């Protein structure tokens, strides 16, 4: 029975490096990882590999969101300083 595969290649080369993914790419892949895990059709080792990938993707998404929040706060700070002068 074939399994759903994410990424390109085989084995550990199947996934693009997480640090190279945009927020949207990481989010979309995370959604797909969750979908595949919820099917429950893989063995333990394969499931763990997908779970680990999902954790890394979630962390990457959080990094992107934190960076966006910092940019917004900086822009708002610059805007409010401009109004005070």
UniProtKB/Swiss-Prot annotation:
Catalytic reaction(s) noted: Exonucleolytic cleavage in either 5'- to 3'- or 3'- to 5'-direction to yield nucleoside 5'-phosphates
InterPro entries from the UniProt entry: Exonuc_VII_S, Exonuc_VII_ssu_sf
GO molecular function, one term: exodeoxyribonuclease VII activity
Assigned EC number: 3.1.11.6
Subcellular location(s) of the protein: Cytoplasm
Gene Ontology CC annotation, any one: cytosol
UniProt keyword list: Cytoplasm, Exonuclease, Hydrolase, Nuclease
Main location: cytoplasm
GO biological process, one term: DNA catabolic process
UniProt cross-references to Pfam families, sorted A to Z: Exonuc_VII_S (PF02609)
Subunit structure: Heterooligomer composed of large and small subunits.
UniProt record similarity statement: Belongs to the XseB family.
Function: Bidirectionally degrades single-stranded DNA into large acid-insoluble oligonucleotides, which are then degraded further into small acid-soluble oligonucleotides.
HAMAP family tied to this protein: Exonuc_7_S
Name of the protein this chain belongs to: Exodeoxyribonuclease 7 small subunit
């Amino acid at each position: 029975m074939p399994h759903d595969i994410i990424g390109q290649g085989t084995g550990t080369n199947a996934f693009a490096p997480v640090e190279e993914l945009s927020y949207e790419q990481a989010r979309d892949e995370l959604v797909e990882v969750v979908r595949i895990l919820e099917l429950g059709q893989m063995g333990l080792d394969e499931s763990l590999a997908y779970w680990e990938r999902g954790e890394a993707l979630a962390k990457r998404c959080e990094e992107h969101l934190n960076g966006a929040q910092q940019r917004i706060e900086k822009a708002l700070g610059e805007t409010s300083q401009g109004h005070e002068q």
